[in-house]
Amino acid sequence: MPDTKEEHPDIPSENKFIKKTPNFVGWAVFVFTISIVIISLISVVFPALIASNNSTAKALEEFGVVLLEVDAFQAGIWAASLLAANFIVFVIAVLYFKKRLPESIKNAINFVFSFEVSKKVAFIALAALLVIYVGASAGELAVEEEWEDYVGLKKRVDNWSPDQVATQFEPHVRYFLLWSSLLLFGNYAVIPFLASISLVLLTYFFTVKLTKKRFAGIVSTVILLQSNIFLTYDTTVSYTNFWIVFYLLSLYLIFKAWPLSPVSYFLSIPSKAMTVMFFPMSLFFIYRTNISRIKKIIVAASTTAIILAGLIAASVYGINLSAVAGTQDEFDSDEFWLGFTSFSYQLRFDGLVLLFILPLVVGLFIASRHGFKHAESMMVLLGGMLLIAPLITGYTDQTNQPYRFVPFVVFFAISVGVLLSRRKI
């Protein structure tokens, strides 16, 4: 049954929620995120459009190289579904706010947004989801991995020892956890699998913390567990979820044990250095939280100090960060724009994400306009995660890999839960 205001006193009242507040930050965040999302969706509708305008392809044609002729405006396999789904969602939304929907449909929508479950029901539901997930995935632990990076990583972990931590910049936290997994369980994949289970639990508890609704947490958990890209990399040794767990934990700890948040963020970096790029998103999240100002300053300053300390240490020990990251001599605009196309093909099996990312962002903006600050934070996280792919290809010689979209899927799932935080729309 729905919970009450007394049960969750920090939930805004309906009147407070409905009262719109002028918010320049909200508009800026929305414009940023919706722009990134729309550019990313171009390749879902027209897969060849961005690639066809690549200057490299044009240069090859000028040199007489015959390229395969591709129609830049040929629709992708998800194009019709994307347009239809978005049209239906936005029409229903407009009719709802214009009070033109049939009463039965309106009541059904209100029921979904106001529905809540008891702690007991939430515990049973979460436990059932975990049992199903673990039971379906545990068999993968006995299967030898076939990723190309696995052989090299296995050799590196076999030769790893704790005394190497201070000698070179590598993902030593990841090596340590894989080394520990082999030492304790005789299998490299056990602790990575436990990390994925932890990520599922964190998704639930983080969503509940943001929304004050257990039902929202269950919905977010279901969305994550149905994700193809999450299930593809949940037991992998080559592309573990350690970095995502530590990063999401750093955000969660801002509410639960704020002095430990920078520690968790620090651990995410030697799990995968790419989390350094999450730094601006972390600062914005801290800025929009409801903790006291002094706590915000301390957490933000500590997190900033971690980045600065890493840069200073690299300088002192002569570590070439450009070489580590594979940084190019100059920015490659062609590769930058091609980076946006990775969204369409890396997530081609995650139809839920492709079809509803645009309505989700619009929904988050509406929620932020009605006073829910966490909606802005989720927009920044979604937009930032999508922007990382083109930044990587534009500034480094690295290619975009599907596993890098796992944190995006996690925040997509949490964002859906955030929409359900509203008691009534």
Region spans (language model):
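Membrane-lumen/periplasm interface segments of specific transmembrane helices
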Residues: 294-364
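Membrane-interface helix-loop-helix junctions at transmembrane boundaries of multi-pass membrane enzymes
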Residues: 208-211, 215, 293-299, 363-384, ...
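Transmembrane-helix signature of polytopic, membrane-embedded enzymes
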Residues: 203-226, 244-245
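Hydrophobic, aromatic-rich transmembrane alpha-helices
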Residues: 199-204, 352-376, 415
